[in-house]
Amino acid sequence: MAKEQQQATDLNEKLIAVNRVSKTVKGGRIFSFTALTVVGDGNGRVGFGYGKAREVPAAIQKSMEKARRNMFTIALNEGTLHHAVKGRHTGSKVYMQPAAEGTGIIAGGAMRAVLEVVGVRNVLAKAYGSTNPINVVRATIAGLSSVKSPEMVAAKRGLTVESISE
């Protein structure tokens, strides 16, 4: 248990959206809250979570726990991406391309939060279609998970890094 606490302290956590939702029943409406969060270590690990509860703090706590449980690693290249990528989830489409040092994170809303916690410092990004935060986060993570480093490509092709970079 102590290891989880220690691990949790060095993660960046961002709350993207809190939404009030309702369920209509015979006696009226039952309100609850949903929370969308992302966590990352700033060094290529990221996860997102979506929690739902009757109170806002409980929904945030649930989503943070889910985000910590669903983390995975992304190949980064000195604070940017190795190559341009596209991601898609339902109606949301995102495009991200590497940028020179000093550019910063040029992205909007939910996409910016994901890129900040994963550790990307320089990127040009654009979201197309639906800007629903949940779908944008999923599309961004889908795009980031498709990033391949030159070492990964070389290993898959059975070549050296120098031969594929020519």
Swiss-Prot record:
<keyword id="KW-0699">rRNA-binding</keyword>
<dbReference type="Pfam" id="PF00333">
    <property type="entry name" value="Ribosomal_S5"/>
</dbReference>
<keyword id="KW-0694">RNA-binding</keyword>
<dbReference type="Pfam" id="PF03719">
    <property type="entry name" value="Ribosomal_S5_C"/>
</dbReference>
<dbReference type="InterPro" id="IPR000851">
    <property type="entry name" value="Ribosomal_uS5"/>
</dbReference>
<dbReference type="InterPro" id="IPR013810">
    <property type="entry name" value="Ribosomal_uS5_N"/>
</dbReference>
<feature type="domain" description="S5 DRBM">
    <location>
        <begin position="11"/>
        <end position="74"/>
    </location>
</feature>
<keyword id="KW-0687">Ribonucleoprotein</keyword>
<dbReference type="GO" id="GO:0006412">
    <property type="term" value="P:translation"/>
</dbReference>
<dbReference type="InterPro" id="IPR005324">
    <property type="entry name" value="Ribosomal_uS5_C"/>
</dbReference>
<dbReference type="InterPro" id="IPR005712">
    <property type="entry name" value="Ribosomal_uS5_bac-type"/>
</dbReference>
<comment type="function">
    <text>With S4 and S12 plays an important role in translational accuracy.</text>
</comment>
<dbReference type="GO" id="GO:0003735">
    <property type="term" value="F:structural constituent of ribosome"/>
</dbReference>
<keyword id="KW-0689">Ribosomal protein</keyword>
<dbReference type="GO" id="GO:0019843">
    <property type="term" value="F:rRNA binding"/>
</dbReference>
<dbReference type="InterPro" id="IPR018192">
    <property type="entry name" value="Ribosomal_uS5_N_CS"/>
</dbReference>
<comment type="function">
    <text>Located at the back of the 30S subunit body where it stabilizes the conformation of the head with respect to the body.</text>
</comment>
<dbReference type="InterPro" id="IPR014721">
    <property type="entry name" value="Ribsml_uS5_D2-typ_fold_subgr"/>
</dbReference>
<dbReference type="InterPro" id="IPR020568">
    <property type="entry name" value="Ribosomal_Su5_D2-typ_SF"/>
</dbReference>
<protein>
    <recommendedName>
        <fullName>Small ribosomal subunit protein uS5</fullName>
    </recommendedName>
</protein>
<comment type="subunit">
    <text>Part of the 30S ribosomal subunit. Contacts proteins S4 and S8.</text>
</comment>
<dbReference type="GO" id="GO:0015935">
    <property type="term" value="C:small ribosomal subunit"/>
</dbReference>
<comment type="similarity">
    <text>Belongs to the universal ribosomal protein uS5 family.</text>
</comment>
